[in-house]
């Protein structure tokens, strides 16, 4: 079936799939932006998980994201720099990946590109079951100070030794920290308390129900403030529209008409911004591989905590 190992993964085929999928959302892929990224990583596409992602908030309006995995022996940021996919920077965001590599074992990387914005993110997946700790990560000089500044918060909710994935956004200069969170973190009172603790508006009733089904969460931080920007929750589902209609008509059209990964599970993420806006991200798969850390990194049964 489309979306599994039987799809074509050469650059031309992947680009064609991106172009068609983005078109379902009335987004036109910029070939001059997308093609150089795909060709830079052409050698790894054969074994990669490839996913498409769309968000409902205004900031992501008109863009469409593509994510694919990269084996641990390939440094995705180094490739991006060598191919001029992104400019070298003296900002700490440019040093974070190499600092993590020197400190931590890495299983897999992920790359995100926008069909308008190009190469923008790298994801670092730690080996399955080998969670990193904030005690180690906060010692990195390139790490945002907001991570260390919120250690008490993360410790309070049992997250300080449960870091599973780090996401580095080079364009927005933000960082995501994914946690293999204890099941209590998805309960209504805890969700409410976590939002209140960091000064975010209370989630809606619909989002509380969404969180009850979550498999994991991540927080977004930056280098400019000591605040946690937002907490996002993820749900794994074969039919995202059964959860809510807030994905919007365009995303609903995408879900119903995308020809790839029809029978594979989707990921839906939800978050509340500081302004009180609730928005959602849908991740659908062009090529699904269940053995990949992209799918297994933070999908371990949420009620099972590592000893």
From Swiss-Prot:
According to the UniProt entry, what is the EC number of this protein? Answer: 2.5.1.124, 2.5.1.125
Control of this protein's activity: Does not require any metal cations for activity.
Q: What Gene Ontology terms for biological process does this UniProt record contain? A: antibiotic biosynthetic process; isoprenoid biosynthetic process
Q: Which EC class does it fall in?
A: transferase
- Give the molecular function GO annotations: prenyltransferase activity; transferase activity, transferring alkyl or aryl (other than methyl) groups
- One Pfam match, by short name? PTase_Orf2
| UniProt keyword terms in alphabetical order | Isoprene biosynthesis, Prenyltransferase, Transferase
Show the disulfide pairing: none
Catalyses which reaction(s): 2-O,3-dimethylflaviolin + (2E)-geranyl diphosphate = 6-linalyl-2-O,3-dimethylflaviolin + diphosphate; 2-O,3-dimethylflaviolin + (2E)-geranyl diphosphate + H(+) = 7-O-geranyl-2-O,3-dimethylflaviolin + diphosphate
**Protein family (similarity comment):** Belongs to the aromatic prenyltransferase family.
Q: What is this protein called?
A: Furaquinocin biosynthesis prenyltransferase
What is the originating organism of this protein? Streptomyces sp. (strain KO-3988)
What gene name does this entry carry?
Answer: fur7
């Amino acid at each position: 079936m489309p979306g599994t190992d039987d799809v074509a993964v050469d650059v031309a085929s992947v680009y064609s799939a991106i172009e068609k999928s983005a078109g379902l959302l009335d987004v036109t892929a910029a070939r001059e932006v997308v093609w150089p990224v795909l060709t830079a990583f052409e050698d790894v596409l054969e074994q990669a998980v490839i996913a498409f992602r769309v968000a409902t908030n205004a900031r992501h309006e008109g863009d469409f994201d593509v994510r694919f995995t990269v084996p641990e022996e390939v440094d995705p940021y180094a490739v991006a720099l060598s191919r001029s996919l992104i400019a070298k920077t003296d900002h700490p965001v440019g040093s974070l990946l190499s600092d993590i590599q020197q400190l931590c074992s890495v299983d897999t990387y992920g790359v995100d590109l926008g069909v308008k914005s190009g190469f923008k993110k790298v994801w670092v997946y730690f080996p399955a079951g080998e969670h990193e700790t904030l005690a180690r990560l906060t010692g990195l000089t390139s790490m945002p100070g907001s991570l260390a500044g919120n250690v008490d918060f993360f410790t309070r909710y049992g997250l300080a030794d449960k870091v599973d994935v780090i996401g580095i956004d080079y364009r927005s200069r933000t960082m995501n920290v994914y946690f293999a969170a204890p099941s209590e973190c998805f309960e209504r009172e805890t969700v409410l308390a976590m939002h209140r603790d960091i000064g975010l508006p209370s989630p809606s009733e619909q989002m509380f129900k969404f969180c009850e089904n979550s498999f994991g969460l991540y927080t977004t931080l930056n280098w400019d403030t000591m605040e946690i920007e937002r907490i996002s929750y993820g749900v794994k589902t074969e039919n995202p529209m059964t959860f809510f209609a807030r994905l919007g008509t365009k995303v609903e059209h995408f879900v119903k008409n995308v020809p790839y990964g029809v029978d594979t599970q989707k990921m839906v993420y939800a978050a509340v911004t500081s302004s009180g806006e609730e928005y959602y991200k849908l991740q659908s798969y062009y090529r699904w591989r269940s053995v990949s850390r992209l799918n297994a990194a933070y999908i371990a049964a949420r009620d099972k905590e590592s000893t």
